[in-house]
Amino acid sequence: MSRKQHTHGAKVDNPGKMLGRLLNYVMKQYKFHIAAVVIFIFVSVLANVQGTMFTKTLIDQYILPLLKAETPDFTPLALAIGKVACFYAIGVGSTYAYNRIMIYVSQGTLRNLRNDMFARMETLPVKYFDTHPHGDIMSIYTNDIDTLRQMISQSMPQMLSSVITIVSVLISMIILNIPLTVLTLIMVFVMLSVSRRLAAQSGKYFLEQQQNIGKVNGYIEEMMEGQKVVKVFCHEEESLEKFNELNDALFESADNANKFANILMPTVAQLGNISYVFCAIFGGILAINGFGGFTLGGLASFLTFNKSFNMPINQVSQQFNSIVMALAGAKRIFDLLDENPETDEGYVTLVNVREENGMLKESKKRTGRWAWKHYHKADNTTDYIELKGDMVLDGVDFGYNPDKIVLHDVKMYATPGQKIAFVGSTGAGKTTITNLLNRFYDIQDGKIRYDGINVNKIKKADLRRSMGIVLQDTNLFTATVMENIRYGNLDATDEDVIAAAKLANADGFIRRLPDGYHTMLHGNGSNLRQGQRQLLSIARAAVADPPVLILDEATSSIDTRTEKLVQDGMDKLMEGRTTFVIAHRLSTVRNSDCIMVLEQGRIIERGSHDELIAQKGKYYQLYNG
């Protein structure tokens, strides 16, 4: 039940490169939107800076003269205040505009990422899903995507706004008073030093937090799938203990990450307040003494700029942790996008054919006859080899890891219409052989031929389309019964679906459902019994009308009464088809043309049921065990 924990990377080795890749991804789709955002940020910052700068003029030229006037005229002051209000109104409007655009950009980017991730996921080999916890993959779609949303919609515009604000305010402070600017920069240097130390600590723990979230999600998903097994073997306490272990690790990393992040902001804020106090004291002395023409209005503007200067630095410090966490998520996302898709060097395709003058000709219409279209580049000719279902495994060696071979020198010959059964202990390699027939995995040595063609030459989609598979675990989708059966052949008509259901003896129970064939199934068909779910899986294989049928534990989960119903339908389905059967109930394979007994990846016995019983070997032991 356990799946190998496979993380997407422990750390972001090059944050700058990862940030650049993310920005490039965003810009590729939304460069004009980003350009508009930059313009609005510039307008917003400059409007606020201009409004603050005008405070000096407002005090020195409007307010102070009014204090000395015997009959003050407030009209010029009102006009000046109106001018300041216009500056700030422009700033507010621009801020709203760029925030609104960034929300659109962030949601659009996340939509594109989800589309790209799902499209890439559909191209990945089965091996990827066998080695990555499903909960960890789900965590990429949920948690990591959400951290990117926060970064793109909030952190990125705030960082850009902060940088522009820092530059604009610094220039304004230099214009107002150089000594006070130097004092401010000294305090900023102290703030940055403290921020860097704290951010480095929190960044490390944020990366751990992302990985631990994936592990917790993966374990929850695993336990949900295997809850019946957990209860049957009374493993509730062990499962809880393991979960507490993973949850405690998540708590530790999250606690440490947020501990340093929460210390960072108030520390930087207090240092900013100290900077403000120092500038107020020193600036007050300069203004009172009129040093360098420094005025009370200049001091008021400078102190406002001091706050404006410290605020973006605080924001940069605050957003730094969010960006570090988002980059950790971005790495996991891009790791998924960078996964190598399933390779397919096949060039032989499956096509509809018709017979003309004793020759097979390709047909664009569905004819009910199929052939392999084999193009020979050397002499520019094309052969059409009729699809019959002849399968040969010749000296096949295979290992899920190249250094650990699990199948050794497997030889097997299946002529069209034969029923071949694989039996053996758990782990003997029965299911592995079926994984090789449809090329979920590729062999290390030997050859597999299908109708005389090396399967490596056949396009994987066409190879798999020619095979009907009934897996041990029945997967049903959130759709109607009709649509779930039609999944085996999307071109099938309603009549084809019903005929397939009748063949699998599923028609009776389907018609007793509330809406018959239009009954909606949810939660992997949780509203059906196990036997009914298995019958739908068999009907799905039947509607594909394949020449080769693979039954992996097809009846191992069905009760005896249902099994009798299935067996009759399966016997009809297997007529004229090459069928490979894997079953622990050896009674279901007695009528096989050939039974192959596997042990530790080797075929140790082969023959009919009667022949193997007479040998009194491994099969005899299994049958009478």
Language model segments and positions:
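An intracellular "coupling" helix at the cytosolic face of ABC transporter transmembrane type-1 domains
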Residues: 28-31, 126-127, 145-152, 156, ...
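Transmembrane helices of ABC transporter permease
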Residues: 29, 33-46, 84-87, 154-208, ...
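Hydrophobic alpha-helical transmembrane segments of ABC transporter permease domains
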Residues: 20, 39, 94, 98, ...
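Membrane-integrated ABC transporters
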Residues: 1-48, 63-84, 98-102, 106, ...
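Helix-loop junctions and hydrophobic alpha-helical segments within the transmembrane domains
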Residues: 117, 121, 230, 333, ...
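ABC-type nucleotide-binding domain
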Residues: 70-71, 353-625
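Helix-loop-helix
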Residues: 65, 172-186, 256, 260-331, ...
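Juxtamembrane helix-loop junctions of ABC transporter transmembrane domains
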Residues: 8-16, 40, 47-60, 86-134, ...
